[in-house]
Curated annotation (Swiss-Prot):
Organism, scientific name: Missulena bradleyi
Covalent S-S links between cysteines: 1-15, 8-20, 14-31, 16-42
Pfam family, one: Atracotoxin
Keywords: Disulfide bond, Ion channel impairing toxin, Knottin, Neurotoxin, Secreted, Toxin, Voltage-gated sodium channel impairing toxin
More info: In this species, the venom of the male is lethal rather than that of the female. Is the sole lethal toxin in the venom of male M.bradleyi.
Molecular function in Gene Ontology: sodium channel inhibitor activity; toxin activity
Tissue: Expressed by the venom gland.
Listed transmembrane segments: none
Protein's name according to its UniProt entry: Delta-actinopoditoxin-Mb1a
Keyword Secreted: yes
UniProt entry tagged with the keyword Cell inner membrane: no
Length: 42
């Protein structure tokens, strides 16, 4: 996983749950992933 503070812009960048959630919380993410998709292996 990349650092959680890195920008999460594309769906393929969001396979690490905490990274995507952290980015979304800080309004840095527009990625639309399902909860099951968030846990897929990178």
């Amino acid at each position: 996983c990349a650092k959680k503070r890195e920008w999460c812009a594309k769906t393929e960048d969001c396979c690490c749950p905490m990274k995507c959630i952290y980015a979304w919380y800080n309004e840095q993410s527009s990625c639309q992933t399902t909860f099951s998709g968030m846990f897929k292996k990178c």
